[in-house]
């Protein structure tokens, strides 16, 4: 860990990298390499995973993509392409070729989702298993739809299916849980059955219609209050890393985190 100024202002401690919990996944919309390097020099200690989003790996020059992946890996960051790109490969019948290319590019793993493509649970399980067993890739399963929604029972069964197939962790699609009202009942039931360290909650992304930065921050505050500092969070933009970190430790202008810095300093919760 680096040295920090203000050593006389105590803060709640966090696990250092490589972390097993409290992971932060940064979403990369084609961040230029120079900015990526500056970003990681400043705040890479708070980034555990990086998703190069959507189908961006297909339109980025090969040598540049490899440099970006290598830069992440050099900082101990797990880099993988977005699940929508995987869905496109499956729909085209090019999944095995996609896995070969992902391996050749240097990605540590992939994401297997069914946001748009309706995949039979057995086929989804087979896709995850193939990537893990035949290609040695770490798989992030993803559960949830970008259009419509799943029942509580369907969502939990899908998470279990991904983990049974060999996924190291399951991402929960933000649209499924946080589009409009937060689906508290679904989250309560899910976290009773699945260990929190095997789940990563996506924050809403502001590139989607009707999603505002204010709403994303509201969801972030709620997640930390509900599940604590060590909840796994995805879809954090490069300029939100520090903000997310100080929110995790309850030092970001809200007293909602019972074990956060403000509350531990004796400041009463404004919600009580």
Predicted regions and their residues:
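Conserved N-terminal beta1-alpha1 strand-loop-helix module at the mouth
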Residues: 1-67
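Active-site-adjacent beta->alpha loops and helix N-cap segments on the catalytic face
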Residues: 7-13, 34, 58-71, 88-97, ...
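Active-site mouth loops of central-metabolism enzymes
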Residues: 19-34, 54-57, 80-94, 140-155, ...
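Generic structural signal for hydrophobic
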Residues: 39-43, 72, 101-105, 131-132, ...
């Amino acid at each position: 860990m680096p040295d920090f100024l203000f050593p006389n202002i105590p803060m709640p401690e966090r696990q250092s990298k490589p972390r097993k919990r409290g992971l932060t996944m940064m979403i990369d919309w084609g961040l230029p390499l120079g900015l990526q390097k500056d970003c990681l020099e400043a705040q890479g200690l708070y980034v555990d995973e990086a998703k190069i989003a959507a189908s961006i790996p297909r339109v980025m020059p090969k040598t540049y993509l490899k440099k970006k992946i290598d830069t992440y890996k050099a900082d101990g960051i797990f880099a993988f392409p977005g699940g929508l790109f995987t869905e496109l490969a499956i729909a085209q019948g090019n999944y095995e070729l996609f896995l070969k290319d992902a391996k050749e590019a240097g990605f540590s793993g992939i994401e297997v989702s069914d946001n748009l493509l309706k995949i039979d649970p057995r086929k989804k399980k087979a896709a995850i298993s193939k990537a893990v067993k035949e290609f040695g890739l770490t798989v992030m399963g993803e559960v949830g739809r970008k259009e419509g929604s799943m029942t509580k029972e369907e969502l939990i069964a899908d998470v279990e299916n991904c983990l049974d197939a060999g996924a190291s962790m399951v991402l929960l699609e933000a649209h499924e849980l946080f589009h409009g009202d937060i689906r508290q009942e679904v989250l309560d039931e899910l976290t009773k059955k699945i260990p929190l360290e095997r789940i990563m909650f996506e924050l809403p992304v502001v590139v989607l219609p009707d999603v505002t930065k204010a709403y994303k921050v509201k969801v972030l505050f709620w997640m930390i209050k509900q599940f604590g500092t060590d909840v796994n969070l995805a879809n954090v933009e490069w300029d939100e890393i520090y903000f997310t970190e100080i929110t995790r430790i309850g030092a970001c202008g809200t007293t909602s985190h019972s074990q956060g810095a403000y509350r531990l300093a004796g400041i009463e919760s404004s919600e009580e």
